[in-house]
Amino acid sequence: MAQVINEMDVPSHSFVFHGTGERYFLICVVNVLLTIITLGIYLPWALMKCKRYLYANMEVNGQRFSYGITGGNVFFSCLVFVFFYFAILMTVSADMPLIGCVLTLSLLVLLIFMAAKGLRYQALMTSLNGVRFSFNCSMKGVWWVTFFLPILMAIGMGTVFFISTKMLHANSSSSVIVSVVLMAIVGIVSIGIFNGTLYSLVMSFLWSNTSFGIHRFKVKLDTAYCIKYAILAFLALLPFLAVAGYIIFDQILNAYDSSVYANDDIENLQQFMEMQRKMIIAQLIYYFGIAVSTSYLTVSLRNHFMSNLSLNDGRIRFRSTLTYHGMLYRMCALVVISGITGGLAYPLLKIWMIDWQAKNTYLLGDLDDLPLINKEEQPDKGFLASISRGIMPSLPFL
């Protein structure tokens, strides 16, 4: 109750997005045309132009964000990735798999380092009210949360799953059913633990190393909460999987019976068309289940994350009020209508989604009460730092 009262006593500022779908649509059309005309060379400039438009039109507490990266800043990095891509293809086509594997592993080893450097560069080139964001972390921590920890968790869950299979017996039909149910439960819980734990640790690590000017962000997520909703999201998918699986299995049996008993070509064609129709229905049910599960998980984790994010020892807090149904129908519209229109509706629907997310995201407090001072930091120099700029991960809401 005290937390509610405290939040009601402080000013609340919702994020406001001033962009329009029509303007963003024109930007995307021009970008696509220029990218085609230049045979892909303009792509870095196109991507940065879109991001600058989105950032420049996002406002909070009366101030708009600024994004200072241009296509020229990341062009060299893109060239390096193109070089690696064609080098790997050439080694594979030249029947030199060993060299191809070495190049691929080299790129993967560098990728985590480059992602951390790229995230730092993105943060430093993003500002609000003239104050830059910053991201500083140890590479040991990055390797732990993004590489070693997932591998150790995967090995641990694989071991548990293997031991579970050895402990179960399938001496009768009833024991087979019990074994399948228990293995499904173990699998669902394992996936939930893996996803929930990783989300909690990765987000806590990223934002605990992020600052706004001289002020640090803090976030302490409830790992049990994240695991719970990761499991519930997967459970929400199961009914759709069951229905889609039943339809597919039924069609496989029908196809087998038809191949045995049907002799008429016209009858075979009709049965084939009917099978294709039901297969499409099964796929649509499956994809809708994915949308339901994804929207549920996204909203649950985002709202939890925002409610636990703070700046300057809690003087500035955040809140998210996204809803499951709001995310679901916007996500479905983004995929379905964009697909039907060949991508033409995507810019309009993306702006619609961003505007809704902004209206349901709040800053609790007043940034003007903080000393708005920049850290004395500059983007990293050197070859590795330069090629890392094309790795463009971004912190949520940055």
From Swiss-Prot:
Pfam families: DUF898
Protein topology in the membrane: Multi-pass membrane protein
Gene Ontology cellular-component annotations: plasma membrane
Localization, UniProt: Cell inner membrane
Main location: membrane
Keyword Isomerase among record annotations: no
Keyword Secreted recorded: no
Positions of transmembrane segments: 25-45, 74-94, 96-116, 143-163, 176-196, 229-249, 279-299, 334-354
UniProt entry keywords in alphabetical sequence: Cell inner membrane, Cell membrane, Membrane, Transmembrane, Transmembrane helix
Periplasmic face residues: 46-73, 117-142, 197-228, 300-333
Cytoplasmic side: 1-24, 95, 164-175, 250-278, 355-398
InterPro entries: DUF898 (IPR010295)
Protein name per Swiss-Prot or TrEMBL: Inner membrane protein YjgN
